[in-house]
Amino acid sequence: MELMVKGADALTVSETTFGREFNEALVHQVVVAYAAGARQGTRAQKTRSEVSGGGAKPWRQKGTGRARAGTIRSPIWRTGGVTFAAKPQDHSQKVNKKMYRGALKSILSELVRQDRLIVVDNFSVEAPKTKELVAKLKELELNDVLIVTGEVDENLFLAARNLYKVDARDVAGIDPVSLVAFDKVLMTAAAVKQVEEMLA
């Protein structure tokens, strides 16, 4: 199949990478797994055994008229422990390479179908200036876009850093979440070829 390239000849690409059927269940599973893996999982609360103090019985068992109590660190008490205390945990889910690649192919194919993938011959800025990048994006009528380049472009990455709903990455930096998070994806021809090789 062929992809239209702005300002250049059409690019011949693999049907299996950019023309496959959309697998919603697979994409959902991989996106959820990717987001789960990004969770810190460092929250921690103390159980009744971990809260300091509470060694002595607050008052005697009988004769006070109050409810019996054995420790001031019971979860019933205001300064007590937490009944089912949250503990640090690993939220990551296992995703096979085949599934991950399949999800990326599925997303890229859907972007092509919805005319959300824009391919240009080359895209760069001369200096790390946000103003320069804004002008370039205005020419292409883009405001909510992920820019993917074939190689690390420090000037472009710095220029995009301060823009809302604009991100710039090289091919190694793309993932399922970033591809679905933006309205449009702008790729250079070199990036398209690299993605194709990566997912072959």
Swiss-Prot record:
The lineage of its organism: Bacteria, Pseudomonadati, Pseudomonadota, Gammaproteobacteria, Vibrionales. Disulfide bonds: none annotated. Keywords: Ribonucleoprotein, Ribosomal protein, RNA-binding, rRNA-binding. This is Large ribosomal subunit protein uL4. The keyword Cell inner membrane does not apply. Residues 42-65 are annotated as: Disordered. NCBIfam families: rplD_bact. It holds the Pfam family Ribosomal_L4. Part of the 50S ribosomal subunit. Belongs to the universal ribosomal protein uL4 family. One of the primary rRNA binding proteins, this protein initially binds near the 5'-end of the 23S rRNA. It is important during the early stages of 50S assembly. It makes multiple contacts with different domains of the 23S rRNA in the assembled 50S subunit and ribosome. One of its GO terms (cellular component) is ribosome. GO terms for molecular function: rRNA binding; structural constituent of ribosome. One of its GO terms (biological process) is translation. Signal peptide: none annotated.
